[in-house]
Design a protein with these regions (language model features):
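Thiol/selenol-based redox catalytic cores and closely related redox-interacting motifs
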Residues: 33-113
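Local sequence-structure signature of Cys/Sec-based thiol-disulfide redox active-site neighborhoods
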Residues: 1-24, 28-33
Length: 113
């Protein structure tokens, strides 16, 4: 099992995800989106694992202006704009190989063990 958690250090759900894997003795790699961000390859792989980049968008993101711009763009521009503005991601994004989840999803992670 190769768990990656993408999130921010201040996100409550990201902290809960880290605690979930720590309590079960499962090793994971934490990637802070504010410090490092997601590479284009990681973004594409995560989007594929989730069934589309649309699932990464947090409709409650604080950056309302960029969120509104994302809605106004044509489909082929939206994916690139989201990649450029990773503060719009819903977190945590948890990846296990070709599987992935967005948000706190322990019922799905349980099946990964």
């Amino acid at each position: 099992m190769n768990i990656q958690i993408f999130g921010t250090s201040k996100c409550f759900d990201t902290k809960k995800a880290q605690r979930y894997f720590k309590e079960r003795g499962i090793k994971f790699q934490m990637i802070d989106l504010k410090e490092k961000g997601m590479s284009r390859g990681e973004f594409d792989n995560v989007a594929r694992a989730l069934g589309g980049w649309e699932k990464l968008v947090d409709p409650a993101a604080k950056d309302k202006q960029t969120l509104a711009l994302l809605d106004a763009l044509v489909d082929w521009q939206k994916e690139d704009k989201l990649f450029e503005n990773q503060q719009l991601f819903k977190t945590p994004i948890v990846r296990n190989g070709r599987k992935g989840t967005v948000g706190y999803q322990p019922e799905i992670w349980k099946d990964w063990e």
